[in-house]
Amino acid sequence: MNSTLTSKMTVQDALVDNGLLGKGTRSLLMAVAITYAISWINWFFTSWQSSRAVAAAKRAGPGQLKRPPTLPSAVPVVGHIFQFLLGGHAFMSRAAKHYGLGVPVRINLATFPSYIVSGRDCVAAFLKDQGRQLSRIPRGLNYMEHAFGCPHEFVHQFKPRDDVDIEHQMHTALQTMLAGNGLEVLAGRYQTEVAHAALSTSLMGKEHEWTELPDLCSFVEDHVLEAATRALYGPHLVALNPTLARDFWTFNRRVKSMFMGVPKWLNPSAVRARDKMTDNVKRWQLYAAEHCNIDEIPDDVEWEPFYGSRYTRVRQKLLTKRDIMNESARAAENLAFIWATNANSVPSAIWFLLETLHDPSLEKQVRARLQAARTESTDENPLNFDVNKLTSDSLLQSMFAEILRLRVAALVVRQPTDAKGFSLPGGWHIKPKETLSMSTRTELMDPGVWNAGDAANPHPLDSFWAERFLVYPDDPRSGPLREPKRRFGAATNSEPYFSLDGCTWSWVPFGGGRQLCPGRHFAKCEILLTSAIFLSAFEIELLTDKLPGPDEGVYGFGTMPPNGKVPCRIRRRKIVSV
């Protein structure tokens, strides 16, 4: 032992004598000191800039425009990007509150500087955009190329033009066809497809036989993705691509990296997943074109088997009208729509199911509401629901609103197009081509807005409360808002009712104003019908006492899915005809 110790001391002495250990230590200390100095200087400089902006804003007189302050940063060049990547919601919420909600603040996410919009008044002005001074940023074209696979040489065809603005035309078509009779037909088709998928599944045994599943979420998302695709695109897209559901969810897990512009050579698995999906879509496009003349289908046909819904046909015709004929470019646009219609509604439906099953008392109430909405069984679908009853039920609506409040985390990004820029309440001025970002989650989790219960009966905003959006006429503390904006005494009975009164610019999972999501009504039908069918078709017992949290890795892109598996045991229920 002594010889070993002597040997170690000899080696150490030799290193010191030769100056090696001291030189390494000095180099390390020098690197730490330089890094610290650079960080401190950058923090000091950005704080000084910010203080000047705040002081100038305070000196501004009535009618004078003010420039927003910058959030201080210790890291030069890349700014706040690491804070954003480590926790998007926490960072955006902290940044929005740095000078107080309602004061726009500049952040720097590497090559993407942006001004955060927060607070009800500023969010209202931002979403209303009454002067039509804001537009989606040009990055949307990059998304078509990198996230959805449009060949670079055809991306320009999706650029807005005065004569044929394809995005506006598709938005208008979607608004028209996902309302009234169009919505009714599509919702009916959707529930038939979901019921068929649920009742014909081969993953479990006969009635009354329990089957253990490693993950309820995967079971639901695969069946619902295929059903939704059949409803919107007809049966052939699924039939031609047996692995479509798994291909889509693999793509969905990787799409964020492509949205953020990670180079192909650093992101091969994501590119492969995207290309697999575009190949699937192209296979359907070619099959449909070969077997059906789209121009011969009457305009008033709401659904047919080759193209599915009327809206899908209209979109294909608009692509042709815009002279977008390349199959890969068309596949990219179709993939973008498939992603938009499933990436948010399916995880929301799963959360609705999980929260219901996690609370036996709530499950009992929900099952009673679902039974009341059952309609006469048919040969085509033995499990029918009155969609209007589902979507107008007070408890189910409250649960729907709460799921979206708690789980949606989208970033709404716009740029001023007017030469004068864009002004927010308070006189804050944003110059042309500067970027504005609004985090829906910051507004949906604002403790100054939402009712979180009281000391005797707390309901924290980061936990699910099924009745948060229910108003009890005889209880002034009920309802979604911390400070209710309603009058009492006018109710004719004591029954609770669903309310979004006063929530217009705070409950913003679908955006708002002229950019309000046109598919919101169908999304509501999807979420409630999915939950109704799975709860009615199966008896499900969760094999975990604690639900997973939301996957904040997808922050900024819509609904955050569960961040873990949910094991369960499941068996078929006997379907009793109504």
Swiss-Prot record:
Pathways involved: Secondary metabolite biosynthesis; terpenoid biosynthesis
Membrane association type: Single-pass membrane protein
Location of this chain's protein in the cell: Membrane
InterPro entries, alphabetized: CYP450_sterol_14alpha_dmase, Cyt_P450, Cyt_P450_E_grp-IV, Cyt_P450_sf
MF-aspect GO terms: heme binding; iron ion binding; oxidoreductase activity, acting on paired donors, with incorporation or reduction of molecular oxygen; steroid hydroxylase activity
Biotechnology section: Fuscoatroside and some of its derivatives show interesting antifungal activity against Candida albicans and Aspergillus niger.
Cofactor: heme
Main location: membrane
A GO CC term assigned to this protein in UniProt: membrane
Keyword Cell cycle: no
UniProtKB keywords: Heme, Iron, Membrane, Metal-binding, Monooxygenase, Oxidoreductase, Transmembrane, Transmembrane helix
Binding positions for heme per the UniProt entry: C517
Reactions catalysed, as given in the entry: 3-O-(beta-D-glucopyranosyl)-isomotiol + 2 reduced [NADPH--hemoprotein reductase] + 2 O2 = 2-deacetoxyfuscoatroside + 2 oxidized [NADPH--hemoprotein reductase] + 2 H2O + 3 H(+); 3-O-(beta-D-glucopyranosyl)-2alpha-hydroxyisomotiol + 2 reduced [NADPH--hemoprotein reductase] + 2 O2 = 2-deacetylfuscoatroside + 2 oxidized [NADPH--hemoprotein reductase] + 2 H2O + 3 H(+); 3-O-(beta-D-glucopyranosyl)-2alpha-acetoxyisomotiol + 2 reduced [NADPH--hemoprotein reductase] + 2 O2 = fuscoatroside + 2 oxidized [NADPH--hemoprotein reductase] + 2 H2O + 3 H(+); isomotiol + reduced [NADPH--hemoprotein reductase] + O2 = 19beta-hydroxyisomotiol + oxidized [NADPH--hemoprotein reductase] + H2O + H(+)
Entry's EC annotation: 1.-.-.-
Entry superkingdom: Eukaryota
TM ranges: 28-48
Family according to the record: Belongs to the cytochrome P450 family.
Protein name per Swiss-Prot or TrEMBL: Cytochrome P450 monooxygenase fsoE
Species annotation: Humicola fuscoatra
Lineage of the species this protein comes from: Eukaryota, Fungi, Dikarya, Ascomycota, Pezizomycotina
Gene this chain is encoded by: fsoE
